[in-house]
Amino acid sequence: MKKLFILLALAAPLAYAGELSCKQGATTNEGITDHWHCTYQGRDLDAAYQAMRQQDLYGIEALPAKLTRRNSTRKWQDSSACDDDGNRDRTVTTIRRTSNSLTVEHLFLGACFNPTDAKIHLQRQGGKILIHYQHSAS
């Protein structure tokens, strides 16, 4: 009986896990910006975000695995210079939350590599969450 309770306790979060369905939107900016539109059946923004991170979408691995509970901006530079002039690659990750939305943007400002931008916006609407993911590279 004890094993059954443990099994039920472990499986309970899965009962509330939502279903994610995605379709690719138009590629814009001469093919360097990809758009994906997804719908997550559920109301948990963090669960929808984690479901999106599990998708095999180009650039999504750049988004942070863990989210802060509050709005935040994190900036950092690579510790070593990438050219003879001392330039360093810079990265900016921004998380913005409201009660019904979540936006995460990861901007790589390459000094020696091409800049990239990955952005995901989740909007709670009724019993589902509408998601727009965009990745740009130049």
Language model feature labels by segment:
Residues 3-13:
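Sec-dependent N-terminal signal peptides
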